[in-house]
Each structure stands twice: as C-alpha cells, then as structure tokens.
Amino acid sequence: MTWTMLPQEYHTGACFDLYRHLGAHPCKGGWSFRIWAPGALDVQLEGDFNGWQGAPMSRDNAGVWSCTAKAKEGQLYKFRVLGPDGSWVEHSDPCALAAELRPGTASRLFDLSRLEAQFTDGVWMAGQDKHYDRPMNIYEMHAGSWKRKPDGSWYDYEELAQELIPWLVEHQYTHVELLPLAEHPFDGSWGYQNTGYFAPTSRYGTPVQFARFVNACHLAGIGVLMDFVPVHFAKNADGLARLDGTFLYEYDSDVGQSEWGTCNFNFYRGEVRSFLNSAAAIWLDLYHCDGIRMDAISRALYWLGDPSRGVNQGAVQFLQNMNQGLHQRFPSAILTAEDSTNFLKVTAPVEYDGLGFDYKWDMGWMHDTLDFFATPFDQRRDAYHKLTFSMSYFYNELYLLSLSHDEMVHGKKTVIDKLWGTYEEKFAQARLLYFYMLTHPGKKLNFMGSELAHFREWDEERELDWMLLRYPLHDAFHKYIAALNGLYHAEPALYEGEYNAACFEWVACQSRDEGIYAYLRKGRGGPLLAVMNTQPKAYLKYPLYLTEGCTARMLFSTDLQQWGGTTRAPSQPQATLPSGVFGRNHTLYVDLPPLSGALYRLEELPRKPRG
C-alpha cells in the first residue's frame, strides 16, 4: 500500500488533527497502523487479529512506522518496540481512539467515522459561544463517583446521562465539567495521569456512548467541558514514557520528572506540540465538547512550577500556539486555565502577547474566601479584607471563581466542614458563602456534592452520600442552591458586563467591626444591591449609603425558613431617606439576620407630581 506523508505541520508543532493521521484506521482490505517512533530500531504490530505474533512494520524518513492488517473493529492491539538498548517493550498506541479496561493496557480498534452519526445537536452547536455576557455556572464532577449502581459498579456514559441531566437541570447549572476522561491506568489519579490521550476511558463505556452522553447534555441545554492534562503524563512503561527507547515525549533531564512522579512533556519538540494540540482538539471536534479546562498550567509556565527556575519559554509558545489554533478552528470553544501564579496576560489574546485563554481560575479568591469563612467570629475583624481584596485585581484577567475537587480531599475537608461554627451555623455560613460567590463578578464552578452540603471528603471509590437528602437541613440546602442558581440565571446584572469595572460598586467595604459587606451589580433591569452579614448577631435598621434615592425590593434572602433560616418571608420594599455621608446622600436602612445575605433590586422612587 502507498502511504501518504504526514502533514508537514506535524513536525513543526502546528497539526491539530493527528488522530486522523496516526494510530489505527480502517482502509481498503483491513486497517492501517501508524506510530511515530524515530529512535526505535524496529517496531512490530501485535493483536487479536494475528494471535499476538509480532508483524513487521516499515519505517519512513520521518521515523513513522506503518503497516496494514486484516482486523476488525473492537479487536485489541499493541506496538512492540525495540529500543536502542536492545530491549523489546510493548506499548499501547499513543493515538488510539479506544482502549482496553484496566488493568489491561492494550488499545482497541475504533472507527472514528461512527461518531458524527451519534449527534443531533445542530441547534446547540450553532448557538455555542464563550458566555462572556451569559450565565456560566459549572458543575465539576468525577464520572465514576457521582453515583453508582446498587451493586457498586459504574454507570456507563449513557446511563450516567439519564441520571445526571435531570439533576443538573433541576439545579440550573449551565455546564458540566468532567474530570479527565482520557484513558488512564490508575483510578486514584482521578484521570490526571494519562496513557491514552485520544480515548475516552473504557471504565464507563465506548466512544459512541460518550458521544451520546454529550449529545444528551446538549439536547437538555447543558454544555460539556473537558478537563485536559497538557503538562505531564503517566510514567507507565506501556504508555508514552520512553516510547521508542529514548526520551521522546518527555524531557531528558531532571525537569523530565514532575512532583507527581509523572513525566513532563517536552514542549520544545514540534511533534509533541502537535500531539497535545490534537489531544485537546479531538474533544471539541469529534465529541462536540464546548470547551477545555487545562490543568496545572503553572507547572508548564515555570520549570517544574518553580518561578525561581525561570519561565519555560517553550511552554509559553506552545500554549499560545495551541490556544490560537484551537480558537481558529473552534471559535466558540471555551478555553480555561488552572493557574495559581501571577503570570501576566493569561487571558489576553496572543496578538497582545497573552497566552490566549478565555478564562483563568481565581485561586486567590478561593483561598481568601475559604480562609475567611473558616475564621472564628471574634477574629473576623482582622480577616475582613479577605472578602474585598479580590476586586482589587479582578479586572486584570477574565476570572472564573472555582471551589473545585482539589479543595475537598487530602484532609482539607469539604466546603461546609471547613466553615466555623456549630452545625446550624455551618449551614447558615454555607448559604452565605455561595450567595457571595453567585453575586461576585466572575463565572462559577463548584464540585459535585457541594450542593448537598457534603461533610465527607470526596473519595473516588465511593458515590456521594445521597442519603443526606433525608435530613431536613441537607434537603433544604440543595433546594437553596437550585434557587440561588435560578436567581443567577434570572438577573442579567449578575453576569452581564461582569468584566467591566463600571458594573460593580462597593457600598460597604470598611465595616470591619460589624462584619457587613454591600456592593452593587449593574446591568439590564436596573442595579442590584447585595448585602452580607458575616457575624452571628442581628442588625436592625443598618444604614447603607447610596448615591441615588431608590426603593429596595428584596429578591432573595439566604435566611428564609424554607432554606433552614429564621425569616418567614422576604421583607417589604424599603425607600431610602434623604440623608447620608461621604457624598452619598441617600440612606437605606435594612434588617440583617445573623450570618445572612440578601439581594435587592433598586428601583427609582416615584416622581412627585408637579404642583
């Protein structure tokens, strides 16, 4: 058979569809197989179709080994590679589209042309956008531990969709973000140590079933975001590590090993860049995902994630080129960076020397918020700034507020269990914390179980504690989250123009002794006033000073009895009085229950008729 050459872009790092060129694909008379292994002395193909007896492959000048075989879809295969040291090692296909269930390590034949027929989401795809002026409220989840069957086994992708989608719709989330689904050998890595970058993990079914999962989400109005690991990969000998007997995908020095015991990708090699470009693109292209969240970007930007070792310029160029290429091919895709550093211009366009991401996780907001709500009440005066500081830098990037899986494990406790106070006070504080999150500028992300007020830390081997819904406070809390998310959807001022400084204004940000915060969100429908009392004492007729006279109509309170609070019903509308301080000549007096928040719509005062 005459082989076509790989596109030149592959070697320069500009290829975004490698899954169409390498790996295994049906061809006339069987299947074609290709693997890039330039340092190998020999490569053989073995699988179900040849009794696992190595069949010879031929090498081209670029180091790509190829052959054809009479095989059938669903059969398993591997490449047997002879390295420069004279040893043979079996490897899974780096570009395999499907894989054997662990502990097996073989690749599985799959025809990618079958995927497009699974989708009926044309209307959704035509309406995709980056949600800059739309609500974006993300439910982060691990597919294997959200819910399990009565016998403890996993739901497959289609079964998971049937269980999950009604829950997402009920709680008015806009997107689901899946912890990495690329194939991985170790359950305890949560998907962050990959061996198969192009294959949805076989734990939960087939590529076709995953495509149907995405399609079902789209038909229900739910976007799908994929967590992606572009910095490091599993060190397993059957994967990418020393694939051709040399340091091919990884660095060959001390920077080749990550803090997790994995191998760091060599961003200076064009073929590695093309591999990663394509590994991200496949989720957007073949599986219709709406965006990519890129993990551990700080570990790429700086050598070993250490700013003192300097910026990794190869990684910077890789991220810029990848983001630019993805945006060109998928203009509506949402690209998000998990980056805990102060690296500048993460969300600036590449043409302005930025990295080209659409959003960046606000790790500072997360730490400050959790630290504040864990602080004893009598020490909060000194911690008051933790809830105001985020707005001093918020407009430097396009930030996304996240309370992710990383904050629910390894002894950190879950969100509600971190919070200071008695059992009842923890619930009041949790309602207040999420109110603060939903009324603060920035897109939102919460990890599964947070809506249940989950006290047990996340364990990938167990489903969530769904029995919590039998307890009144937990049942009320998940209904509270659904209502709060609904409020976010319903009020444009909570998401439109949120990256415009003119759409936010502090009303009370120096009330340290009282623990009171108040701020305006401005948008269509008029301004909204958010007020928070972070102390376990009530304030009656607390004064808030405004620049315009208005009537304040309560839209939402965290303290309603239906949520587990003490207030029977929202307060009646209150008009400002013509007195004030500091150039704010109108005073609004509000009653603030302990550990509570409220959102008011500010309406113009009726005009007095002319006499």
Regions found by a protein language model. Give the residues of each.
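Carbohydrate-interacting/catalytic domains
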Residues: 1-134, 157-168, 172, 425-427, ...
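Conserved alpha/beta catalytic core and glycan-binding cleft of carbohydrate-active enzymes
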Residues: 288-290, 304-460, 489-544, 548-557, ...
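Short glycine-biased active-site loop of nucleotidyltransferases that positions the nucleotide triphosphate
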Residues: 58, 187-191, 235-242, 347-348, ...
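Short, flexible loop/turn elements at secondary-structure junctions
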Residues: 37-39, 49, 61, 142-147, ...
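Short, contiguous acidic/charged loop-to-helix segments that flank catalytic cores in large enzymes
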Residues: 197, 201-205, 267, 309-311, ...
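Substrate-binding/active-site clefts of carbohydrate-active enzymes
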Residues: 120-133, 142-311
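Non-transmembrane alpha-helical segments in soluble domains
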Residues: 165, 169, 214, 280-284, ...
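Short glycine/proline-rich turn/loop motifs
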Residues: 138-151, 194-197, 256-267, 409-420, ...
